[in-house]
Each structure stands twice: as structure tokens, then as C-alpha cells.
Amino acid sequence: MKLSRREFAKANAAAIAAAAAGLPLASTASNLITEADMTRLDWNKAPCRFCGTGCSVMVATRDNRVVATHGDVKAEVNRGLNCVKGYFLSKIMYGVDRLTQPLLRMKNGVYDKQGEFQPVSWDQAFDIMAQKIKQAIAEQGPEAVGMFGSGQWTVWEGYAANKLMKAGFRSNNIDPNARHCMASAVMGFMRTFGMDEPMGCYDDIEAADAFVLWGSNMAEMHPILWSRVTDRRLSHPNTRVAVLSTFEHRSFDLADIPLVFKPQTDLLILNYIANHIIESGAVNKDFVGKHTKFARGADDIGYGLRADNPLEMQAKNAAKANTWEDMSFEQFAAFVKPYTLERTAKESGVAAERLKALAKLYADPKRKVMSFWTMGFNQHTRGVWANNLIYNLHLLTGKISEPGNSPFSLTGQPSACGTAREVGTFSHRLPADMLVANPKHRETAEKIWKLPPGTIQEKPGFHAVEQSRKLKDGVLKVYWTQVSNNMQAGPNVMQEILPGWRNPQAFVIVSDVYPTVSAQAADLILPSAMWVEKEGAYGNAERRTQFWHQLVKAPGEAKSDLWQLVEFSKRFTTDEVWPAELLAKAPDYKGKTLYQVLFANGQVDQFPSEQIEAGYANDEAEAFGFYLQKGLFEEYARFGRGHAHDLAPFDSYHAERGLRWPVVDGKETRWRYREGHDPYVEKGSGVQFYGYPDKRALIFALPYEPPAEAPDDEFPFWLSTGRVLEHWHTGSMTQRVEELHGAVPDALVYMHPDDAKALKARRGSEVKVISRRGEIRARIETRGRNKPPRGLVFVPFFDANKLINKVTLDATDPISKQTDYKKCAVKIELVSLA
């Protein structure tokens, strides 16, 4: 039956009215309802797949396909809004080149490092993986096996990977790509507070009187949070916004105090503000006396380069970078005294009046301050110091752990906090802030995991940058990466990463959804399920854990990373990967598979599939015969419950738009360390930084030190890399969305117009960006969103056709091991005028 638009509207209105009144429907209305049922959409909640903000979206599915999404109006984080990437979530899974079957490099029907990719079965793929790992462990020990994971792993994927590597293969060589983005934030928290993750939450935005952005372009990288900051600024005229960066970007549009500083001199500015607070009498003496102590950190700590690099050989304290000594307040005041307004203005290039206006925001006792930072701070050879120094300002003034007063580290990935940090998928960590080097922590993990003593190795494994070096050097023989694209995102691709991956001694496996640069450089590609093709959990920047159900099936033979990890564990018996002396402590485990020991261990497999909410698929439960996700989560939660990392019971999260840990007696925590908000703070104490036994936070004396590489006559420009609004990280998802790719198809070299003119170039000219390590070609942009000062260029890293990380330096913070992508020296050469 065909209806005109007018007839359709009338019939639809009749149907609604009749249904509301309980009346029988007219025949035309009945037909309409029947036809509508054929096009019915099923809507369910899920956290966004992109950044660490943790927006919730409503996902519409029909006929095993995601067909639409919109912002979740019930979500506290985004309140129904999405950024431009979020609006196109429904398209990220359906690129024409989606991987749907395992692919192995082969020649004449057998594996060959120089062969072409050919389809194989999952059994064939796992057979060669198992063969390579068994051979590597037998010949060289657990150190020969490594894994590179992700802040995009779901909580249970990261947890399963951690167990398989650290307990099953007994190798701590597992690290997430969050090493590139959040490791300095982690160590900043750990050094200052003795515990990781923010004390505040997004609610601080609506209570703050000032916002200070340190190396954070929130307008493009965290636009939903920026909309809340903007609303606060425009609706409360007394609110002020300060933005600090090495170049102007869109966040400067809202800035009352704009500050463009010379690279690395943020350390000078931070120490100047501390000095201003002291000299102006703005120290909160009562707070400082009760809740803090002072420490002098080691200096001259090197740059995390190879040991034979002259910069490392000259560094006096490279071996003890993460050490400090006690000092007094008076000694601290004397330490920061040389960081005067005059010196800071001269060396940073920022006008003195702007520096003073910034310092006054922190010093004013009547103004609540929220500090935000992301990669500008963290991707820094002194990123941990920068984190420590921003905490100094909040601690000296007592502006912390209360509504509106909040130093807040923003995250870039959806579960960099919930998986990489909280689960502990770093090479030196275990769940809930525990460390592999701590015997008590290893003992706790071994008890929870039901393992014999001594299973977990005490030596930290290779971190992300070191993994590339060890592949190149032939130390790592088997390397499995999941949910990451390090061949595009990692530093110094041509000298370190590519030679390592293509080392004839190495066997590299990539689990992904698209044929990324990394996949194309691998030996074996495994097709993965993504986002709502599996049941998942993420943890966002404000400690909010969010769950979602599996809503559709993955295409072809694609499988979730969780299935891959757990199914693969069946290929090994303990006799093949554990030494005899370890098995002697647990004779019942002899001959058992790692699957039986790690996953079918009476804990992980205790929840039957029947507990899955009716109406939802769960491919892993179907494969293994139990509710795997629930079992992994409840076992993992044992690490944190009772230790200020409390997670709610598993079933609570499917009913909520996320809960912020610690969750005690069903109540989430918005402000940590503050009495009345945090259940772990003792009554009458007001504030307790209970990460340390004395419940005091550390205020660090740390100096300015220069970057690892700076411009010179041969390479006269600074290079900074980063992102743009329309694309996320390496663009493997967003570049496959026609609207986003069409908006920004290519990475550009953002440059000051006068620098372009000096090169006899102009907007649109093609140039080479050349460093001591590699080069790329791209076109110049002298207008638009990013406005570098003279002597600096900015190039985003989303474009696989313009791999800017061929150019970058693999210098890292010696404490956090996080890469500095914001500072290296390049030269620019004109290719064509355009």
C-alpha cells in the first residue's frame, strides 16, 4: 500500500492517538505500524570509541549493522552532545578495506618473511604463532617475547593480555601505546601523591573561576569538555581562561590570557609561578604545613636515548632519575627564587604582564583554578617534572581536591585510564597501582591469580620505545600488537621501528580492523572485532568506568582481541613455557594449558552464560561456555577493592552511565582525598593524600633543563606534531569516514607566513620536512586553525601518506619513558611553488 506524505502523517497521528487511548487502529494505521516494524531501530548505550573524555552515545542497530548514533542525553559527561567525530561513529566499522580473515606472509605455500600476504585459517595463524613463541622461549627465555597493546583495549582485553604475558609467558615485555601519551601523567601522580589518576572530576568545570590550559588544545582534542568550559566562561563574566602553547590554536579564541612560549620553557614558567606565590605571600601555610612535604628531585637525568648516545653518556643521574631527597620549605623557596619574572619573560618569550596575570590566577585565594593538560606536558623529555610542577602550584595554595580547584590531566584514548593504567598493562605495573618490582605486589597478584610463588618476574619489561630497539637488536623475537598502529604513531620510524619489525629474526603479529601501516609491515595480520561488535568496558579521564553490550556481529572471520588472547592460550602447556623449579611448586599445574591455569581457573569461569542480559549476543561466552567478561572483571576488581581503587559489582555498570571509582557501598567518589567526599579519608582530617604512609603530598624542586635537540644553523626550525579535530590519532578509523576525510584529507605543514616567504614559498607550496632521521613531503598552510610563531612548524600525524614520525626523535622522559613528539629540529626545503 502506498501513502502520500499527508496520508502518512494522518495515519501516524491516528496510530499514536489510538494507542494512547487504548482504541482499535484503523486499517491504514495498522498497516503503517506493520511497515514501521520492518524498519525498527534498536537503541542501546555505549561510550564513544574515540578520546578519553568518555562521552556516552546511543547506538542504533538494524539487521546486524550500526546505522546511526547520537549523543546520550542521560549521560553526565556529554549531556547529549557529540563532537564531529562522534557524529560519524556509525561509519567507522564499515570501511571497504575491513580485514575479515587472517593473512600470513607466504611463498610457495609456507611462511616467508619476504612473502606476500595470503589468507590462512585461524588454526594456521595460531599454529605458527605458537611455534615461534615456544621456540623463542626455549632458546632465549621469556624476554624474547613481547606485546604492544593499547589504551583502546577494553578493560578485560587488557587484563587478559596482562595475565597471558606476565603470568603465562612470564614476560613483562608488555606495554600499551598509552606509554606515548599518559606515562608522564602516571609518574607525576605517583611521585606527588603516591597514587595514580585525578583527584577531581568534570564537575569541577562548573565550579571553577579560572581555567589554565598547559599544552592542551581542548577546543579540538576534547571539544565536549571545551563546550562546558566555554559555557562557564561566557555565563560567568568573572571567569578567566589562560592558554599556554608553543603555537596558537583554536583554544586561543577563548583566551583572556594567551601565552605562546618557546619550547621547553614551560618549566621556567611553572617555577616562576611558584616563586610568585611565595614572594606575594599567597602560600596557604596551614594547608602546606598539614598536608605536604618538600623534596629535591634528581637532575641531569638524560633523555632516554640509546645508552651509547653522547647525551646519555654525559648525564650524571640517568641511572637514578626517579630519586629525590627531603628538603625544607625554606630550601624550596630558595630554589625557585632565581626564577624571576624578568628571567622567565626573557627566556620564554612571553610578555612579562601576561606571565604576571597568569601567576595571579593561582595566587588569588578567592579564585578557584582548574588546570588542564595533555600531550604538551606529557610528550616532553621532562614531562614528569612538568606534572610535578603543576601540582606544586595547587598544593602551595591549597587549591586541590575540592569543587572547582583541580589539577586535571586529560587523556587521549577511551581507556588509557581504565585499561592501561588501572589494569596495569605497562611493562612495570600490575593492577591497581601495583608494581612488578615490589615483592608484596607480586605476591598479591600471584595469590589472586592462583599462581605458584615466583611466577611473575621482578624485573620490569621493555617499554614501548625500548621494544622497537630490542626488535632491531634481535633481542625480541616474537612481537604481538593489538589495537595500535605504532609504525605510524611511534617515533623515529626509519631508524628504529621499521628496521626492528623487518628484522629477519623477528616475527611480528598485528591484530587490527584495517590494513594500517603497521599491519602492512607485519608478518601475520589477525582480523579484529571492534567497538560494539563485542561486549566492552572503558575507563575515562575522571575515573568513570562504563560498560556496553555486544550489539552486532563482526564481519567475516574477525574476532575480538579478547577471544584471540584466550583462545591462543590453549596452545601452550605449563611444561612448555614454565621452568621445572616453578612447576615443582605447583605440581597440579603440570601438563595443564595456560587457558586452564589463567582463564578456566575456577574464578574467571565461575559465571554461567545465562547471566548475560537477555536479548544480547556474546560471542566470547558462546565460544568458551561461560560469561568471560564478568569473570575477568570480578577477578580483576579484587586488586582494588579495599585499596581505594574499588570498583562496583559487574552488573551495576550495565545499568549506569558509568561510575567514578572508588565506589564504596554503591556510592561513587567525585573528589578524592577530601573528607566528606572520599570514603578513605579519616574523619576530622579534612584532607589526606593517603597514597603515602604519612598521608602527605610531595612538592618537588625541579629545575629547567634544555631539550634533547634544538634548532641550529643546519636544522633551523622546531617541529611539533599532534592532532586535528576531524581525525583521531593515526586516522585508521576517521580516514575511512567520507565526511571526515573530505574535510581534512591531508596533513599540512602549518607555518608562519614570514617563514614561508623567506623560503620563497607560499600557502599550498609543497615542501620537504627534513630531520637527521628522515623526511616527508607535504604542503604548507599559512592560515587557518594553527598559527605557529616564526621558527616553528606543526604537522599532524593522522596521515599515513605523510608519516611525520619518520622525522621525529625517539627521546623520552627518563622517568616515564614517554616520547617527546613536540620538540625536534628540522629544515624545510621547497619542492614546488604550487
Curated annotation (Swiss-Prot):
Per UniProt, the cofactor note for this protein states: Binds 1 [4Fe-4S] cluster.
Q: How is it modified after translation?
A: Predicted to be exported by the Tat system. The position of the signal peptide cleavage has not been experimentally proven.
The record's GO CC annotations read: membrane; nitrate reductase complex; periplasmic space
InterPro entries found in the cross-reference section:
Asp_de-COase-like_dom_sf (IPR009010), CT_Nitrate-R-NapA-like (IPR041957), MoPterin_dinucl-bd_dom (IPR006657), Mopterin_OxRdtase (IPR006656), Mopterin_OxRdtase_4Fe-4S_dom (IPR006963), MopterinOxRdtase_cofactor_BS (IPR027467), Periplasm_NO3_reductase_lsu (IPR010051), Prok_molybdopt-oxidoreductase (IPR050123)
- Protein name from the UniProt record: Periplasmic nitrate reductase
Q: Which cofactors are reported in the record for this sequence? A: [4Fe-4S] cluster; Mo-bis(molybdopterin guanine dinucleotide)
- Tell me the ranges covered by the 4Fe-4S Mo/W bis-MGD-type domain, including all copies: 41-97
Which proteins does it associate with, and in what oligomeric form?
A: Component of the periplasmic nitrate reductase NapAB complex composed of NapA and NapB.
Q: Which residues form the signal peptide?
A: 1-29
| Recorded name of the encoding gene | napA
Q: Where does substrate bind?
A: F797
Similarity section:
Belongs to the prokaryotic molybdopterin-containing oxidoreductase family. NasA/NapA/NarB subfamily.
Q: Name one GO biological process term.
A: nitrate assimilation
Q: Which reaction does it catalyse?
A: 2 Fe(II)-[cytochrome] + nitrate + 2 H(+) = 2 Fe(III)-[cytochrome] + nitrite + H2O
**What PROSITE patterns does UniProt report for this protein, alphabetically?**
4FE4S_MOW_BIS_MGD (PS51669), MOLYBDOPTERIN_PROK_1 (PS00551), TAT (PS51318)
Which residues does [4Fe-4S] cluster bind?
Answer: C48, C51, C55, C83
Task: Give one GO term, molecular function aspect.
Answer: molybdenum ion binding
What EC identifiers does the entry list? Answer: 1.9.6.1
Q: Where in the cell is it found?
A: Periplasm
